[in-house]
C-alpha cells in the first residue's frame, strides 16, 4: 500500500484501501481541487480560517477528518463539528476519514508527539499512501496545511509533505494578539474547566460540543469522587445494589450526545420552547435506560444538567455568561415543566411537603448560586 526507505505498509485485504478510494472517487468534483486533512479536536476559528483560505484558492476543497479515536472529542463529534463549521462554504465537502491517513496504523507517532527516526519513517509512509492513493482517488492537485510554529513533529511532517507532494501549500496560522489560535489551547482550557476561555477560540458552531463536554466531565468527576458514603463511587456501590461504577460510567456515555443536542437548542438568540427540550430529554432518558438495562442511574442529573446546558449555551450565544443571567434562563426554562405524578419522588414531595428537583430549578438553584 505504501513504502518508505526503511519500511513498507501492507494489508491482508483487497478491499480496505480499494473501498476507501472508491468512496473518495464518488466525491470527485470538476475543476481545480484541493484537500485539507485535520484532526479538529475541537474545530476552532483557526480551522475555519484554514478552510476559508484554502477554499479561495481552488474550485472545490475536500476536508478529511483524522478518524483515530485518541482525542478529547470523538471522531463522530469532530466530524459533526467540521460539517457544521464548513456548512457556510459552497465549495467544500467534508469527507469521512480512514485508517490510511494520519492513523495509529500509518503514523502512530502523531498521537504521542515525539520526533524520532521511527517517526520520520511513519511520516514518509503516511505521505506516500496519500500521494499514491488518496490524492489520485479524489483527483486533488493541492494539499493545504497550517503553519506549525510550535509543534516540532507536525512541522517536520509539513516539510516532508512538501517534498513528497509538490502540490503542498502552507498557510500561515490565524493569530489573536500575536498568539496562534490552536485546538491545544482550547483543550488546555477545558482541562481546567474554563468555559469562557475555551469558547474564545472555537468556531461558534463548536460551542455546543464544548458545553456538552464540560457537562459530561462534571458527571464523571462526581462519579469518580471517592469515597462517597452511601453513593456509588470507584470502589463501592453505596446504598445502591442495582448499580456500580461501570454502569454509571456507561450511563454517562449514553447521555453525552443528548447534551450536545440540548446545547445546540440553547445556542440561539431565543430560548427554545419547553416541548423541544422535553423531546430531547425523553430520548436521552430512553438511551440511559437502554444502556443500563432499565436502571435509573441519572434521571435527576439529566433533568438538572440538561436545563443548565441549555441555559449556559444560550448565555454564550447572547454574550451574557454570568451567574445572574444563567439563573434567569434556568428559571425560565424550568417554569415550562409541570410536576410529575405517579412517581416515588412525587409521593415523597406530597408526604413531606419539601421542594423537589423542579422547584429548585424554578428558583434557579438558590443553594448553588
Protein language model features and the residues they cover:
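Long, hydrophobic/aromatic-enriched structural stretches that serve as scaffold segments
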Residues: 257-310
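Phosphate-rich cofactor/ligand-interacting catalytic cores and adjacent structured alpha/beta frameworks
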Residues: 207-270, 274, 312-369
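Short, well-ordered, mixed-charge alpha-helical segments that flank or form enzyme active sites
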Residues: 151-155, 177-180, 304, 311-313, ...
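Acidic/polar active-site rim loop that often engages polyanionic ligands
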Residues: 111, 307, 346-350
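Nucleotidyltransferase catalytic core that binds NTPs
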Residues: 1-207
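Catalytic-loop motifs flanking and including active-site residues across diverse enzymes
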Residues: 182, 251, 301-308, 364
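Compositionally biased, low-complexity linear motifs
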Residues: 2, 54-56, 61, 309-323
Amino acid at each position: 500500500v505504501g513504502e518508505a526507505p526503511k519500511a513498507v505498509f501492507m494489508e491482508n485485504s483487497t478491499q480496505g484501501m480499494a473501498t476507501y478510494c472508491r468512496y473518495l472517487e464518488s466525491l470527485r468534483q470538476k475543476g481545480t481541487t484541493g484537500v485539507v486533512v485535520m484532526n479538529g479536536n475541537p474545530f476552532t476559528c483557526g480551522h475555519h480560517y484554514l478552510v476559508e483560505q484554502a477554499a479561495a484558492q481552488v474550485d472545490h476543497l475536500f476536508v478529511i477528518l483524522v478518524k483515530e479515536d485518541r482525542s478529547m472529542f470523538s471522531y463522530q463529534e469532530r466530524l459533526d463539528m467540521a460539517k457544521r463549521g464548513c456548512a457556510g462554504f459552497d465549495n467544500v465537502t467534508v469527507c469521512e476519514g480512514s485508517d490510511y491517513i494520519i492513523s495509529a496504523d500509518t503514523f502512530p507517532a502523531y498521537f504521542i508527539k515525539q520526533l524520532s527516526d521511527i517517526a520520520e519513517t511513519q511520516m514518509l509512509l503516511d505521505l506516500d499512501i496519500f500521494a499514491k492513493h488518496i490524492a489520485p482517488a479524489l483527483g486533488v492537485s493541492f494539499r493545504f496545511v497550517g503553519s506549525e510554529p510550535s509543534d516540532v513533529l507536525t512541522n517536520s511532517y509539513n516539510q516532508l509533505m512538501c517534498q513528497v507532494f509538490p502540490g503542498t501549500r502552507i498557510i500561515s496560522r490565524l493569530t489573536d494578539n500575536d498568539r496562534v489560535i490552536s485546538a491545544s489551547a482550547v483543550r488546555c482550557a477545558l482541562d481546567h474547566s474554563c468555559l469562557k476561555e475555551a469558547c474564545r477560540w472555537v468556531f461558534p458552531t463548536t460551542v455546543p460540543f464544548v458545553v456538552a463536554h464540560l457537562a459530561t466531565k462534571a458527571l464523571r468527576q462526581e462519579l469518580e469522587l471517592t469515597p462517597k458514603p452511601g453513593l456509588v463511587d470507584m470502589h463501592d456501590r453505596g446504598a445502591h445494589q442495582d448499580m456500580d461504577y461501570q454502569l454509571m460510567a456507561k450511563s454517562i456515555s449514553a447521555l453525552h450526545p443528548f447534551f450536545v443536542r440540548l446545547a445546540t437548542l440553547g445556542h440561539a438568540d431565543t430560548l427554545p420552547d419547553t416541548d423541544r427540550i422535553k423531546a430531547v430529554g425523553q430520548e436521552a432518558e430512553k438511551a440511559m435506560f437502554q444502556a443500563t438495562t432499565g436502571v435509573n442511574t441519572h434521571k435527576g442529573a439529566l433533568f438538572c444538567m440538561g436545563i443548565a446546558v441549555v441555559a449556559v449555551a444560550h448565555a454564550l450565544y447572547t454574550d451574557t455568561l454570568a451567574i445572574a443571567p444563567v439563573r434567569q434562563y434556568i428559571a425560565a426554562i424550568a417554569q415550562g415543566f409541570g410536576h410529575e405524578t405517579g412517581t416515588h419522588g412525587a409521593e415523597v414531595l406530597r408526604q413531606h411537603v419539601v421542594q423537589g428537583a423542579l422547584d429548585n430549578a424554578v428558583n434557579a438553584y438558590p443553594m448553588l448560586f
